[in-house]
Amino acid sequence: MSILQAAESMPGDLAVRLADADAEVRRIAVMELPYSDEDNILPLLLKALADADPQVRAEAAKAVEGFEEPEAVTALLGLLHDTMEETRRAAADTLSELKSSSNSGLLLQAVDDADPFVKAAVFRALRPLRVADSLAPALSGLDHPSPQVRREATGVLGYLKHAGSLGPLTRVAMNDPDPEVRRIAVGALGFATDVEVLPALTHALNDSSWQVREEAAGTLGKLKLSGAVDYLVTAMADRYWQVRVRAARSLGRLKAAVSLGVLSEALTHEISNLRKEAVIALGEIGDPRAIPALETALEDPDPDVRKLTQLALKQIQLNNPPR
């Protein structure tokens, strides 16, 4: 008996309602399935995934999350071509929650689909699985005409952290016409281990999109590239405070004493998040020359800033014991 045939013979009120002529009754029954006492609800879910009503199929696509069986994955891949957008998106969302790499084979079979939505959804599902066989399709996806496909392909490469993708990711970070693709590529360069990516990241600090600049400022700090200090100091004057926050955080990680001036200036910024990051960075740098500015911050109107300032001052004192 097949898994779908098993659904036909399964007793219980839910099974009866899933066969009701009223689509709304079936839809509500699907919503209840994950919370039912049925020992094996997968056959019922698979039947609902093939329901004649698109709303029922959409609910089934949501309800099947957590099932890793090939039958469920195959059915969800089929729903990526559904006539209703809600159903397609529900299927894509559930596929993105797959945890077992054993499903990568089914996903890779669909990665060359001509539909950009399907292709992007498959890349999105492959990303957390980190399977080596997704490298080649993802590299190819960087040149796809659809920005959504390029975004998801770039995300796959970021998760794989393969040295062979550094060059292509650098090119994308600097040249892709879509700002979100550039932002994802900049973040993906965070797995690099040398200064090869420094030109691309410093270039990104001048990107027209502030989200790309923000990502670049953060990535430079993660890599702890000393050659980035001057660029990060300049980024502390960015017109978007979100970029300054990341730059301040990175300057602290780099323990860049040359940034004491710009970090001290940030202690008076109207955005408290930036003041907090500047205080933390000054504490990490540990230079006694920051003490006067930090003592002023002890009167900050934000209690979190005041608390962090006390910690930063203690940190500086510990790093500079009296002789």
Residue ranges and their predicted role:
Residues M1-G66, K307, K314:
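N-terminal alpha-helical scaffold/docking segments in eukaryotic complex subunits
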Residues E32, A63-G66, T94-E97, A125-P128, ...:
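Core register positions within helices of long alpha-helical scaffolds
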Residues F67, E86, L98, D115-P116, ...:
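Core solenoid repeat modules with strong leucine/isoleucine-rich periodicity
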Residues A237-L311:
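Ankyrin-repeat and related helical/solenoid repeat scaffolds used for protein-protein interactions
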